């Protein structure tokens, strides 16, 4: 029992030796003081080092040449506040001068590096913004750039083909005239003008007058029936069911008479067809520029050549 008590009593100095480390029991550890001072700093004190955002993209004012920029406040007051605050919050047991000097040295170094970094970043940002404003000011102040603004849509130049004079073939195209009416007898001028078929929906929908009559008088049903009942591939009865010159004329008219009992609108087909012929003749008479005479003599008219004018001053 005594041996165990002695071994237990002898183990206490062995456990206490690494904790003492050759110092007295009343002397504090400087590392504990440093960690305590670092934990004392709050977020408000750390943010006070840089209280403005220097990397904004907002509009900046061009500095005037007569005015000097206001000096930035020094960070001495911040250092004093940062240094003075931990001293008030120190526990009473840390009152030795060596502990204070060893704890303040790394903290002051970190603050000085942060403040110097903020100064250098401020200088670079202000210098870059001032250089940009100088470039912008010189570009906007230039007079020829403002005067060279295009305000009118430029017109395309005339094509070389438009500037060429009419050739002899173009001049002699309408040289053949009618002896009676005096109008041109070329193929282009004497071709009959049909009624327009794309006059609906801004010339996008195809709707001719013949199709309107076919669908309005139900003749489209008769054409479909004749198309399916015809055995001959060359038979055109379906295209013109009321024709008297084609084959099976009696059969077609008899079938149309029977269908008119169920479709009374078929009785309006022949009057509508006559109105269409009348409208076609009136439209052709108004819009055809050439000759409409059947038997007339053709006269060749020479196109007079105009000599060039001499732009000379009168004497």
Swiss-Prot record:
Keywords: Cell membrane, Cell projection, Cytoplasm, Cytoskeleton, Developmental protein, Membrane, Microtubule
Residues annotated as site: Cleavage: 144-145
Biased composition (Basic and acidic residues): 20-32
GO biological process, any: animal organ development
Region annotation (Required for interaction with TESK1) ranges: 178-315
Chief location category: cytoplasm
InterPro entries named in the record: Sprouty, Sprouty_domain
PTM description: Cleaved at Pro-144 by the prolyl endopeptidase FAP (seprase) activity (in vitro).
Spans annotated as Disordered: 1-39, 51-140
Compositionally biased spans, kind Polar residues: 1-15
Keyword Cell membrane: yes
Low complexity: bias regions: 108-140
Record's subunit section: Forms heterodimers with SPRY1. Forms a tripartite complex containing GAB1, METTL13 and SPRY2. Within the complex interacts with METTL13. Interacts with RAF1. Interacts (via C-terminus) with TESK1 (via C-terminus); the interaction disrupts SPRY2 interaction with GRB2, potentially via disruption of SPRY2 serine dephosphorylation. Interacts with PPP2R1A/PP2A-A and PPP2CA/PP2A-C; the interaction with PPP2CA/PP2A-C is inhibited by interaction with TESK1, possibly by vesicular sequestration of SPRY2.
Family per similarity comment: Belongs to the sprouty family.
PANTHER family registered for this protein in UniProt: PROTEIN SPROUTY HOMOLOG 2, SPROUTY
Comment on protein domains: The Cys-rich domain is responsible for the localization of the protein to the membrane ruffles.
Described function: Antagonist of fibroblast growth factor (FGF) pathways via inhibition of FGF-mediated phosphorylation of ERK1/2. Thereby acts as an antagonist of FGF-induced retinal lens fiber differentiation, may inhibit limb bud outgrowth and may negatively modulate respiratory organogenesis. Inhibits TGFB-induced epithelial-to-mesenchymal transition in retinal lens epithelial cells. Inhibits CBL/C-CBL-mediated EGFR ubiquitination.
Name the UniProt record assigns to this protein: Protein sprouty homolog 2
């Amino acid at each position: 029992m005594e041996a165990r008590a002695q071994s237990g009593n002898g183990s206490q100095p062995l456990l206490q030796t690494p904790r003492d480390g050759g110092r007295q029991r009343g002397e504090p550890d400087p590392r504990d003081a440093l960690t305590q001072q670092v934990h004392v700093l709050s977020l408000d004190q750390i943010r006070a080092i840089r209280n403005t955002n220097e990397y904004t993209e907002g509009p900046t004012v061009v500095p005037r040449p007569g005015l000097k920029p206001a000096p930035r406040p020094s960070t001495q007051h911040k250092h004093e506040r940062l240094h003075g605050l931990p001293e008030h919050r120190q526990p009473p047991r840390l009152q030795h001068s060596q502990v204070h000097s060893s704890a303040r040295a790394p903290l002051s170094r970190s603050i000085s590096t942060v403040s110097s970094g903020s100064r250098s970043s401020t200088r670079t940002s202000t210098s870059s913004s001032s250089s940009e404003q100088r470039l912008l000011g010189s570009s906007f102040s230039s007079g020829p750039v403002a005067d060279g603004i295009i305000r009118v849509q430029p017109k395309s130049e005339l094509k070389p083909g438009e500037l060429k004079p009419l050739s002899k073939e173009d001049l002699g195209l309408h040289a053949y005239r009618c002896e009676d009416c005096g109008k041109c007898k070329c193929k282009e001028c004497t071709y009959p003008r049909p009624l327009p078929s794309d006059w609906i929906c801004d010339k996008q929908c195809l709707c001719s007058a013949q199709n309107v009559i076919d669908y309005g008088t139900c003749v489209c049903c008769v054409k479909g029936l004749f198309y399916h009942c015809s055995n001959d591939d060359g038979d055109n009865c379906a295209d013109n069911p009321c024709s008297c010159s084609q084959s099976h004329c009696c059969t077609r008219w008899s079938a149309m008479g029977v269908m008119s009992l169920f479709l009374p609108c078929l009785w309006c087909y022949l009057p509508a067809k006559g109105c269409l012929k009348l409208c076609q003749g009136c439209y052709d008479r108004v819009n055809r520029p050439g000759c409409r005479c059947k038997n007339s003599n053709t006269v060749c008219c020479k196109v007079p050549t105009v000599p060039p004018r001499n732009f000379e001053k009168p004497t």
